[in-house]
UniProtKB/Swiss-Prot annotation:
InterPro entries: Antibiotic_NAT-like (IPR028345), DUF436 (IPR006340). Pfam families: DUF436. This is UPF0340 protein LACR_0494. Belongs to the UPF0340 family. It comes from Lactococcus lactis subsp. cremoris (strain SK11). The lineage of its organism: Bacteria, Bacillati, Bacillota, Bacilli, Lactobacillales.
Length: 180
């Protein structure tokens, strides 16, 4: 796989998704990543540390530059736990759990984030305002209600299907209510 091309395509996708989701500084963005799918394989069966490193590095830098927190979802072997900065866990009072991600228990995205983050910790539950799913990893459980699908500029990254979610407040009150 051409890693330079992957880097460029990842940048195009994350820039587009951030524009469409309108996520703000201080908010949380969740990433689900199957490097196996990006690599043209079946999720969980062809993990690539190099692919994870490229994708997470681009997304982490882009979000950090905007003051947005990145949460990287693990695979099902870690119950889809999330790797985040300890600062965020403390700020949100999210319970920290003990595990160090590995390529086949957590995934390439978590391994890359573990190396990039200043003080990485794992938590089991978060509420993110938006997210990006590379390879059909099912990030919806981590995105705040009400979730709205976002169609990224590219539907694929390598061999992986790409989708995204944003959220909005619930509309309550029925026909008498007014909304912005």
């Amino acid at each position: 796989m051409d890693l330079e091309k992957l880097k460029e395509e990842t940048q195009i996708i994350i820039d587009d998704v951030l524009k469409q989701t309108e996520i703000k500084s201080g908010q949380v963005f969740v990433l689900g990543l199957s490097s196996s799918e990006v690599n043209g394989g079946l999720i969980g069966h062809a993990s690539s540390a190099e692919i994870g490193q490229v994708i997470v590095s681009v997304i982490h830098k882009t979000l950090s530059d905007k003051g947005i927190y990145l949460a990287v979802q693990a695979c099902e072997h870690l119950n889809r736990a999330l790797l985040i900065e300890e600062e965020l866990a403390d700020k949100k009072d999210w319970e920290i759990v003990s595990v160090v991600p590995q390529l086949h228990a957590g995934g390439s995205g978590q391994v890359a984030a573990y190396q990039l983050f200043k003080s990485p910790v794992e938590v089991e539950h978060i509420v993110a305002q938006a997210g990006l799913d590379i390879g059909d990893t099912s990030i919806g459980m981590h995105v705040k209600h009400v979730q709205i699908p976002v169609r990224p500029i590219s539907k694929e990254l390598g061999g992986a299907h790409v989708t995204s979610l944003k959220s909005r407040p619930k509309l309550i009150g029925g026909e008498r209510a007014r909304y912005e």
